[in-house]
C-alpha cells in the first residue's frame, strides 16, 4: 500500500492543477478586465455543455483576487447557465495563492443577451462560431 501512495498523491494533485495549465483563448476586454476561455475543456452531453472561462481583472477585486476561473455549465435548450466551480487567485492567469475555492454548483440562471456568458454559450452550444470582441 505504501508504494501505491507514492504515485497516487502526485497523480491526484496533477488532476486538480490542470486548469492552471489550460490553453486559454482571448475572448474580449470588458471594463479593463480580460476574458478568456479554454476550447479544449468543452464537453457536450445531450443538450448541456460545460467549459472553463478565465477573467483577468485590471485591478484587485474586493476579494483581493486578480484572476478568477469559472467552470460553466449551459442548458442549451432552456438558455440557462450555472457555475459548477469558481476559483480566485491573487495573480493574473491563475498564479499566486488560491484565495477563493468554491467547488459547489450554483443555481441555474438566465443567460443575458449581449453578455460575455452568452458569447461563451454560443460556442459551447454550437449556435455559431465564437468571435472575439474588440
Residue ranges and their predicted role:
Residues 19-134:
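N-terminal secretory-pathway/extracellular module detecting exported/lumenal segments
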Residues 1-8:
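Bacterial N-terminal signal peptides that target proteins for export
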Residues 9-16:
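Bacterial N-terminal signal peptides
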